[in-house]
Amino acid sequence: IFTELTAELTAELTAELTARKKQYEYYRDTLLTFGVHREGTFETKWRTLGEVCGLQAGKAIPAIEISPVQTKEYSVPCYGGNGLRGYVKTANQQGDKPLVGRQGALCGNVCYATGSYYATEHAVVVSDKGFFNSRFLYHALVHANLNQYKTAGAQPGLSVAKLEKVKIPVPEKEIQDRIAKVLDNFDAICSDLNIGLPAEIEARKKQYEYYRDMLLTFAAADDIILTDRQTDRQTDRQTDRQ
């Protein structure tokens, strides 16, 4: 029964996470599809990324200089084409900016870096020219599905020149702030669920294992008691016969 309860809980938590992700994606797509929703009463300007942002690929760094874990010496986050790659000693970027992966099957993947960090040659750093709330820009780039602009081939790629031609909405700053706040809240909920789900499942598994082991221990102890009683009875019978 404990196994069934654990499986049922896992299914429920996974369904909850999936539902929240779909809800987040729905609101993100609704809020970032300008001129279509709100009965067409809301319009905004559209600009190419090259007009409103500076785009520059990072710099190559030998794999030997990247640590998989963060230490006192290797304390700077290092981002590649698919997000966080590891940690390095020194940074080559500063500030809160979206990064776009530019090589491989997942090119077009967007992550968000803050503070000081290192961007490799497989990541394009997107620097705002004064038009955006950086979090709104991040969400807009995710919504743009940049992977659709990749070049075909054994090693798909996404060039800076092609990214510069992609058009994105540039609403008023006040609207950007409001949209970014809503989407960040949903993002935080999904992140909490992502963290909480494995922890909750692990806790239930440990609880199941604890009760299982306790029951097995009781069963084993009961067998020992029964065996001892049988031995005592046999001893008594032998004594009586004598």
Question: What name fits each language-model region?
Answer:
Residues I1-Q242:
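Charged, alpha-helix-forming regions
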